[in-house]
């Protein structure tokens, strides 16, 4: 028990576990990565690791929360001169998420896991529900926070579907952006004219560059937040 208390108060061990898990999930995939391999690669005792994280889902749960926040900061920097354009922020951030999944099948797997498992999906929904209230309250004037939580369950289903299906020569990334944004913004009662404007603006950004900036910064972001 003393070891457990020590580990719980040792953020460096937790940070090392998360950084190592992130590298292994990206290199080998979520399913192929075991807790023992994470312990071995991180240099953290297996018993200490399982005290902090009882299973892989809890690790990916925390990682996805960090990735979501890292995405948000990337977009905040990109749109620092357009802070008042809340819908554009939402559109760029969600398309960035699609781009990250499109950049690697192992990243796609991590996102699919995060939207399908109970603990990690709750992190996603809780994290996003308050943002939805801030972004779309002008269009959803009768909604309370519980309504936005339920809305995020619906939007999460849309996101999961678009994440899961890879692009090909017919379903190009350009078409994925259009269909995704049309769907989610219509659900949020955004006017058609605004949707068209947002889609045109979003397509002007270099998402390959944004994906690289987000993923390159994730390891240092983990260190700074834990």
Predicted regions and their residues:
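Short, Lys/Arg-enriched anionic-surface-contact patches
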Residues: 5-13
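Helix-turn-helix
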Residues: 16, 24-58, 62
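Helix-loop "lid/cap" segments that line or gate small-molecule binding pockets
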Residues: 95-102, 113-116, 184-187
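Preference for well-ordered, secondary-structure-rich cores of eukaryotic proteins
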Residues: 43, 62-67, 150-151
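Amphipathic alpha-helical packing segments from all-alpha helical-bundle domains
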Residues: 113-163, 174-179
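Short linear capping/connector segments at secondary-structure termini
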Residues: 76-79, 110-117, 200-201
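C-terminal peripheral helix-coil segments that are non-catalytic and often amphipathic
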Residues: 133-142, 168-226
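Hydrophobic alpha-helical connector segments
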Residues: 62, 73-107, 127-129
